[in-house]
């Protein structure tokens, strides 16, 4: 199956690269309309995935990641329209000059080629990944999780129907419907067809892709995000920020998983936070010995807890004596995604932003803002936590490469 699908997307990538900006934008706008028109059809297929998930006893938080409603489908359509309105990076000239030999050298943006996307649960990723790849002249091979197979299949069917109506080869998007681990590993090693592989999901998925893939990988989004409450922090502000980052949507990668508190305010802040957060939702605190003394309820934290992406109403807590200790702790356990400091000390804020090794570093704000739309990128294909090629929310430019065009008049060397 991988051989057949890989050849299709590889062949189609040549046509995708030739599409004009107007052709791409017109198609994305029509696809947005088509999604809304097919709302009932999509929800009907999504219901099969939801029933299967509930039958397997999956938690409601994880079921929510699968669920497609009329509003969420409308939001997906809005995302398509926003991508259509974004500037097309393909063909953008980054630099141009004439060298000492008289050669005219231009560097411009071009598509990556063929993108492989391996992801879990959220069927909206099917639309996000396709729209960004299509806008940047790439073809894409999608492999979603077995838990969202019916949703992913109907979404790809709708995309393909619209491609055929627009007289664009439908090979610019293919779905690996065999969700077995064996087929997934074949996809990870399909380097003769795929130019890049982007995994999006749990730490387990991403680590497996890194271990097995021969296709170049852009690592995304394990989100062990931490908030440090400094001694000068406004404790009301800190409480609001932590509650939002932990409880607003705990199953996403930019939710807070860990809290670090300065010892001078721990006895005042931790009871206040625990009281207020439990009014929103009961949260389990896994805390070090010093933090436990300030909490009315909690369990002892292990080293593993400080590095864990819980994706649930669980928060690890560490008390530290100073900013340097906080930075060292965060850099030790962080997944390099998003970290935040709550402080009124300008120099501590600057030091934190300078020394924390993460894709996004906040001062006095929730980590929940790390998102392609918020950062002005439109839809995102993922949030990269590595340093090569792309880092942070990955929009259109992250799905491009560059090439040099050199014009001469007979020069030799």
Swiss-Prot record:
Keywords: Amino-acid biosynthesis, Cytoplasm, NADP, Oxidoreductase, Proline biosynthesis. Its main location: cytoplasm. The keyword NADP applies. It is an enzyme of class 1 (oxidoreductase). It catalyses: L-glutamate 5-semialdehyde + phosphate + NADP(+) = L-glutamyl 5-phosphate + NADPH + H(+). It comes from the Bacteria. One of its GO terms (molecular function) is glutamate-5-semialdehyde dehydrogenase activity. It is found in: Cytoplasm. Its EC number is 1.2.1.41. Pathway: Amino-acid biosynthesis; L-proline biosynthesis; L-glutamate 5-semialdehyde from L-glutamate: step 2/2. SUPFAM superfamilies: ALDH-like. It holds the Pfam family Aldedh. One of its GO terms (biological process) is L-proline biosynthetic process. GO terms for cellular component: cytoplasm. Belongs to the gamma-glutamyl phosphate reductase family. Catalyzes the NADPH-dependent reduction of L-glutamate 5-phosphate into L-glutamate 5-semialdehyde and phosphate. The product spontaneously undergoes cyclization to form 1-pyrroline-5-carboxylate. This is Gamma-glutamyl phosphate reductase. The gene is proA.
